Design a protein with these regions (language model features):
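Charged, compositionally biased interaction regions
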Residues: 1-148
Length: 148
């Protein structure tokens, strides 16, 4: 789907569904609380609701994020959020998931938990003074100018 279905129902605490790409849905979820590597009950509940939500399962990929507007705004944002905030060994879920002959699968949407987790490092923020000093080094006539 290229737009959010009118009949899409989300569990309590999940909101603001946004289309990232055709077939890819970003949904804001509640703040992540599970420790690194542990299953998150919130995500399990999301997938259980997905078992009965036909509208959700029209999306092959659903990502649960902290800010769905930011995630869906550009492809770069989507790639950054999903692949820096998820661990394939711990943050991949599926609607109506199963294991058959040691192979995991799901009959509904593949769901990736790409929220900021308690064990993640805090976000980097620019220091204006450091930025100013680096800009001066790269300015015309500066020691780094010939490389830029």
């Amino acid at each position: 789907p290229a737009e959010v279905p009118a009949d899409l129902q989300l569990p309590a605490g999940f909101r603001e569904p946004r289309i990232c790409l055709p077939g890819v849905l970003a949904v804001c979820g509640p703040q992540a609380a599970a420790a690194g590597g542990e299953a998150d009950e919130t995500m399990e509940r999301f997938c259980q609701i997905g078992c009965v939500s036909e509208a959700l399962n029209h999306f092959p990929l659903v990502v649960v994020v902290d800010d769905s507007d930011f995630t869906a705004r550009t492809l770069n944002n989507f790639l950054w959020v999903v692949f820096t905030r998820s661990d394939p060994a711990a943050d991949v879920y599926g609607v109506d998931s199963f294991t058959q002959q040691k192979h995991w699968g799901c009959r509904g949407s593949l769901v990736i938990d790409a929220r900021i987790k308690p064990h993640h490092a805090p976000p980097l923020s620019e220091d204006p003074q450091v930025t100013q000093r680096v800009d001066a080094l790269a300015a015309r006539g500066g020691p780094l100018a010939k490389y830029l």
